[in-house]
Amino acid sequence: MKKILYVFLIMILAVGCNNLSNTPINKTEQMLKKYQMLDNDVMEDLNKTVDSETTFSEAQKTEYKNIMKKHYQNLVYEIKDDTIDGDEAKVNVLITVTDFKKVLDESEAYLNEHLDEFKDEYGNYIASKYVDYRLEKMSEAKEKVKYTIEIKLTKVNKEWRVDTLSDETLDKINGVYKY
């Protein structure tokens, strides 16, 4: 009889603990940790994005992936609050990421002021030189920026699921949001 009660108690605890992880906050943390841990889904998305980039050489694609991996691993977040309304929820998160937007803006300004540095001996603009320059500046970036992101979730079959992230949220996570 004790063994039956013991097994029953273990089952109740297992089911109860499983429900503890099924909260909007926990699902949001799991999603953000996927970035920090370079989860397969995150890497697949990064690879698809980079592979579709036609102006990057293979070496530049590899360099960009390495920069973004480091960026994701250094992502810092703080859950601020959550709001649950039936089967929908919103979780507000303060994230700290590398400020790539500033670097990209400065790189573009440099290009405009020093266009001759990115031309060949015939005066033709060489896009790959500029890409190399931007990647170098991104790899040197140290400044951080804080953004508040709103993660939306929907409960499907009693399970909270993170909705598709908005472009704005993705830009913030990637450090390129125009502020």
Can you describe what each PLM-predicted range is?
Residues 1-4:
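Positively charged n-region of N-terminal signal peptides that target proteins for export
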Residues 84-88, 157:
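Residue-level signal for tight coil/turn positions that link beta-strands
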